[in-house]
Amino acid sequence: GEGHINLKGFRQNLDVDLYLKNPSTIMGKLNDDERVAAFSVRVLSGGMIGSPYNSVGGLIYGVNAEQEKKVSKIKDAIVAGDYLTGEKRELLIGDEMADLLEVKTGDRIVLTAAKVNSNELTQDLFRVKGIFEFGNRELDEEIVFINLADGQALLDMKEGAHQIVLQFQNEATSRDNDFVLLENNPTQDLE
């Protein structure tokens, strides 16, 4: 994406408690703004990704599969299996992480993360739907993608979101310091 919307401070340390409580208000504004070509709502958390053979720390992204296709290259990076369909407990994993965990498509993965507001640990079981390769070791070794609803459930955050990623009609808009979409938002401090 060419731009991000999140609560002020979130990008500095990815604090799961700094999330947009009602992203639908922002999404309505984005839908009405002709400068915005597409956007995708995400939740994101650090966590443990485990298989029967190994565990690694990494980032868990909960994404809206349809929206994400318009703002990122995840679907194009799939090298085995399939992209997310929206079915419960699907997971995309990088080829490097899949090697570390000794998993392939169809195998089970346990995700462990901290719930928002309580920091209580939570776990859920997922199946590897697809394996991606971006060609960037950090991305391929440290990130998994799950469906947005599963991410919200895992983190116990209902309709919330950590980030909205933007794609603009004109890429130059991403450098426009006068992009005032988010001004006058009295309820949340956005950046």
Feature locations, PLM:
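Short amphipathic alpha-helical segments
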Residues: 1, 89, 160-164
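Mechanotransmission and gating elements of multispan inner-membrane complexes involved in transport
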Residues: 115-191
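Residues that scaffold the ATP/ADP-binding catalytic core of kinase and kinase-like folds
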Residues: 70-71, 100-101, 154
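Cytochrome P450 core scaffold surrounding the K-helix E-X-X-R motif
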Residues: 67-75
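Hydrophobic, regular-secondary-structure patches
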Residues: 1-59, 82-87
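Structural motif
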Residues: 34-37, 101, 159
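Hydrophobic secondary-structure segments that place a key small or acidic residue at a functional site
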Residues: 42-45, 58-64, 77-149
